[in-house]
Design a protein with these regions (language model features):
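Glyoxalase I/VOC metalloenzyme domain signal
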Residues: 1-43, 54-160
Length: 160
């Protein structure tokens, strides 16, 4: 049984999304996000079980880089690309972080992105649309693009 969002309430606690991922290359990852991309950061947060989170600000969003003292294995995620809007960027410029994630700086407003954009792969576009709009309450912008507050989600077909 699913609970659908009435549209009156948002599934977000703030007007944007955060994104997080695990890394096995924390020193290289921190250098990438702090030095190469220049994102401001906070002191790391330690959790039970040997988990540590490094938080980097991206407007109102937070990039959460997580590490573990234990083997975390590898499991695929649906994130395909992270977009960062930048007033000083004239055309999209892609790079890859130390974990192989594609990170693209885009001009502010490119694809409707004002801060954070996330490209997501889904095996079923209609199911993903239903989940984002009817369950999460995100705004359908057409062409498989959704607004989660001021975060833009771009969904593409994944036939794997």
């Amino acid at each position: 049984m699913s609970k659908e969002n009435s549209g009156e309430e948002r599934a977000l606690s703030k007007n944007c999304m955060d994104i997080g991922f695990f890394t096995r290359h924390i020193d290289k990852a921190l250098e990438f996000w702090r030095e190469e991309l220049g994102l401001p950061f906070e002191e790391p947060v330690k959790f039970n079980g040997g988990l540590t989170q490094y938080r980097h600000a991206l407007g109102d969003s937070v990039i959460k880089i997580n590490t573990s003292d234990r083997d975390i294995g590898s499991s695929p995620c649906g994130y395909q690309e992270l977009y960062i809007a930048d007033d000083n960027t004239e055309a999209p410029v892609s790079t890859t972080d130390p974990d192989g994630n594609i990170v693209t700086r885009v001009p502010t407003g490119h694809l409707g992105i004002q801060g954070l954009g996330i490209k997501v792969a889904s095996p079923n576009l209609e199911t993903q649309r239903h989940f984002y709009t009817n369950v999460m309450g995100f705004k359908d912008l057409g062409s498989h693009k959704f607004a989660a507050g001021n975060t833009i989600l771009l969904v593409e077909q994944n036939n794997k």
